[in-house]
Every structure is written in C-alpha cells, then in structure tokens.
Amino acid sequence: LGCPLRMVLRMSAGDLNAWVALIGFVLGVGTGAFALKNGFSLGRAHETNKESGAVLPVLMLGILILATCSTLLKASEAGPGSFHAPIIMSLIGGLIFGALAQKSRMCFAGGIRDAILMKNFDLLTIIAGLFVVMLIFNLATGRFVLGFNTPGIIAHSNHLWNILGMYAVGFAAVLAGGCPLRQLILAGQGSSDSAVTVLGMFFAAALCHNF
C-alpha cells in the first residue's frame, strides 16, 4: 500500500495498518543487513558516460510534457488517484523536498540498516524528524485519527500481506543500496543502476494496478 515514505506518512496520521507494516519493513531491512554482513555485494559502481545517466531524467520530463500538454496519458477521474495538488505547486514542492532529501542522504532502509550494522542513527534521526513534523501537522489540522480505518487513507487490515509486502520492500532496498525514494534521488543524480531500479518499480506498479 505504499513505499516507506508513504508508510511513515500514514503512521503519522494514526493509521495502525502502517505500524503493522513497519514490522515487516524492519524485518526485511534486518534480513538484508544480515546478507550484507555475510558478504553480499552487487559490486562497486563505475563511472560511465553522462548520456546514460540522463536517460531517466529526460524520460521523466517527456512524461511530464505528455501529461500536461496532451490527452495521450489517462488520469484517474475518481478515487484517491484523482486527488493531487496543482502541477506548479507539485513541481515546486518536489524540487524543495528532493533537494533536502538529496543533501541529507535520506533513506528509510539505510537508516535502519546503519543502526543495525554500525550503531549509527544519523539517517534514522532524519526519518524520525519527518515523522514528528507530520505528526504535529496532522494533530494541528485535525487529520490524526488513530485506528485501522483512518479517514482519507486507502488501506486494508490484512496484516499478513502488510507485513510481507513491506518485508519485501525492506529486503530489496538494502540489497539494491537504497529505498525507493533514495533510488529516485540517485537516478536524478545520474546513476544508471538506480534508473533501472526505478523503471523496475514503475513496471511492477503498473502490473499490480492493472492486473
């Protein structure tokens, strides 16, 4: 029901389903940390030409142009998929948040991984800060509703699948070198490996939503 960022946002809104999913995420990251400790590695990154690193950003720009200047791409007319901020506000907000996330090296899986392997809580502190800020916002605006049926949040209480789904995300994130947010940031920095990972996430999400 969402990436680790979405999970934390749901947690801050009082959604107990997200807290259940956190169990799976921590266990998945722990399993990945165990694999790293026992020698798992995808090898060292190597510099390539700049053109390969620009493929995904150019592709994303093309999708943005198609979404705003044509009717080729379909958009949801009802349900949660139809709710979004104005395009300009989304771009400005995304640029600000993306810059802060890049500078702080924000990574949800990395924070737990570093805490387990190196007893380093720097990245985890950033995640905790985000949670506290959003918790205060939700409390101040009356959006905080504690329970398994939080208004405005599309969720289910099938706890086994919540745990297993986020376990897979946590495990894969550690092996790939970063959570979905971190992969998106690295792809924007020019990482071809992360670009392939992001494309894989898009493809898998499309399969899950359409079949």
Segments the model singles out, each with a brief description of its role:
Residues 1-211:
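Membrane-interfacial helix-loop segments of redox and metal-homeostasis proteins
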